Amino acid sequence: MFVAGNGNGRVEVFDLNNDGTLAQPTATYILGKPSEHARRTHADAWSESQTEFPGALAVEHSNQRLFLVDNTTGQSLPGRGSQIMVFDIHPDRIATGADVLFILGQPDANTKTSGLAANHVGRRLGVAVDEANQRLFVSDGSNNRVLVFNIAPDRIATGMAASTVLGQEDFTSREPGLSIRRMSRPGSLAFSPKDERLFVSDNGNNRVLVFDAAPDRLRTFSAATDVMGQPDFETASPRTDMRGFA
């Protein structure tokens, strides 16, 4: 089990029993810091083995990798951004203080600037993995979009470009919107492998968008197939009943 701790600026890894209960109350490994006693001490302290402000994470079991969003202190400051760190979590190779395998969303592990490109993200990120098709979905909240990366072992690379973008017509646009194709400040993501649907929390519009994410049908600027929390794709009113969100 992987637990991202913002206060300590690290990820704690716990062993579980076969029934899902904790094997022991203490973490077995620490990712993002060199030892079990290390914690976040000051801003701008990150590297290939150091996390600063870990957030959303997703585990990919087939290749045993952890995709972790690492934010920077002072996210509201101009120019600050986030990155996605990819760790090897194979039982034979995982280790406290291990270096990352790859960095996505930034050119390297030492960069956390807010950007707008196929290979450069902003901040307020969410992640979800499609294991069968080896894809990583990344919600880029400050750029009002969702990026799709090919994470196959023979394709993934530090600083790589996304293959598809949702919510925008291209990789250099970031306008928020309210429609069947646009979104505003997307956050949490969930992927359903059974029917290949992607659920996007469209925070700025008080709704959840549902996309047909089958590889042969998902395209840049695809239209959502369904909306939850609103009666249609043109409404964004906050609601407090059983059918709405706020």
Model-predicted regions and their roles:
Residues 1, 42-63, 115-132, 178-193, ...:
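Signature of short aromatic-glycine-proline-rich micro-motifs recurring in repeat-based ectodomains
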Residues 1-3, 65-68, 135-138, 197-199:
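Conserved beta-propeller blade signature
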Residues 5, 24, 51, 60, ...:
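Residue-level signal for WD-repeat beta-propeller blades
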Residues 6-7, 16, 71-73, 79, ...:
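Short loop/turn segments immediately following the C-termini of beta-strands
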Residues 9-13, 29, 81-86, 99-102, ...:
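A short loop-to-beta-strand structural motif that recurs across blades of beta-propeller domains
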Residues 14-24, 87-97, 150-159, 211-221:
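Short loop/turn segments immediately following beta-strands, especially the blade-tip
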Residues 25-49, 96-119, 160-180, 222-245:
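Surface-exposed loop and turn segments in beta-propeller and other repeat-based domains
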